[in-house]
Amino acid sequence: VVVIGGDGSFRGARDLSERGIPCVGIPGTIDNDIACCDYTIGYDTCLNTIMEMVDRIRDTTESHERCSVIEVMGRRAGYLALNAGIAVGATAILIPEIDFDIEKHVIDRMRRTQKTGKVHFLIIVAEGCNVDVEELAKTIQAKTGVESRSTVLGHVQRGGSPTARDRVMASRMGNYAVKKLLMNNIGNRVVAAQKEEIVDYDIFEALNMKKSIDLALYDVAHEISI
């Protein structure tokens, strides 16, 4: 059995493997939060969809000199928010892995940016931050005087035609997984992309791994936002 999905799917594959059914897992989740691999199928497509949607929102944000507060997916991981925020030039990015203070990380940052002459702003918020983006927009408007609007992108992020990167990586992982199964029914493995190479791990080992956010990338986002 080839199982495509995230942690929940892999736990199911583990249980099947324990019952003697050869299984190979392929990481497929837009959150990119599978610890054993650098890249999960679906992530790049979702990231590009977010970028396209935010670019459209930015058109009116710029023309009306507003602040747009945009919630993107990512319940436990901020990879989408962080990379999308960098790609669209967000003023502030809030992700669940890093503690934040609205006054310090949003309001003060906007005020500093205003002093440079900027009159439009994008705030990207991962859903896992548990921030009410509508209330945040009201707070921003009250404290900065900048007209603010909120948008929850929702399930539009989950659909769409896969990017070339997703298609190529899915093909490589699928090919690798089938070869593993054909090698004397070798199962109980998870396929992973590590530094552009396709490798595999024991499924129990993979489930026990923990993935952390790239703090250096977060610093880049902070440095280029003003």
Each model region followed by its residue ranges:
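A broad detector of short, well-ordered amphipathic alpha-helices
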Residues: 11, 79, 83, 168, ...
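Short, well-ordered, mixed-charge alpha-helical segments that flank or form enzyme active sites
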Residues: 9-13, 31-35, 76-80, 200
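Accessory alpha-helical/coil subdomains and C-terminal extensions
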Residues: 4, 15, 22, 42-147, ...
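Short beta-strand elements at the ligand-binding edges of bilobed clamshell
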Residues: 36-47, 161-167
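Short gly/pro/ser/thr-enriched loop/turn and capping motifs at secondary-structure boundaries
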Residues: 29-34, 100-102, 155-158
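Acidic/polar active-site rim loop that often engages polyanionic ligands
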Residues: 26-39, 62-63
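C-terminal non-catalytic interaction/assembly regions of soluble proteins
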Residues: 132, 138-226
